[in-house]
Regions:
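Minor-groove-contacting beta-hairpin "wing" of winged helix-turn-helix DNA-binding domains
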Residues: 89-92, 125-131
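Short amphipathic alpha-helical interaction segments
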Residues: 97-115
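Short, amphipathic alpha-helical interaction segments positioned at domain boundaries
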Residues: 132-149
Length: 149
């Protein structure tokens, strides 16, 4: 709380903000955030949000199993952020059905993604894409699109 006459309070307020704004600016520089509008724009040709759930618009045979899982989790993330889904997580069973491979392969790929911190496992055993996972997908997008098209 600032006390004193108006001039002293004004000086104190300016000093406070002068000290705090650089701290906020530094914190902003190291805080990892996702620009949802950019994610939607970047991935609009790859993922879709259907009433039935997350979908891919590209042939799965052009992607690795890990990429497929990441794209489905990204679609769930976007769907949740847009209020179209109750959670941004998907169960192992949902992901296995989307991947179209055995549960063992699905679990192995998910385990690898968790180990790389691209995906996180929730308390109930579901999976969600991590913020760093979204960023890495954005960084890898050009190479992935080259492989696809």
């Amino acid at each position: 709380m600032f006390t004193g006459d108006a001039d002293n309070v004004w000086v104190s307020v300016n000093r406070f903000f002068g000290e705090m704004i650089p701290t906020f600016d530094m914190a902003r520089k190291v805080t990892l955030t996702v620009d949802l509008a950019k994610v939607i724009e970047d991935f609009k040709d790859i993922i879709a949000i259907a009433p039935e759930g997350p979908e891919l618009l590209i042939p799965k045979d052009r992607l690795t199993d890990s990429e497929i899982l990441q794209f489905y989790l990204l679609a769930a993330y976007v769907s949740f952020r847009l209020g179209k889904r109750l959670t941004d997580a998907m169960t192992k069973e949902e992901l296995q059905a989307k991947l179209g491979k055995s549960m063992k392969i699905t679990a192995t790929r998910l385990g690898e993604l968790v180990k790389q911190s691209i995906v996180t496992k929730t308390e109930d055993g579901s999976f969600r894409i991590a913020t760093i996972g979204v960023k890495k997908l954005q960084e890898d997008l050009k190479a992935i699109k080259t492989e696809i098209w």
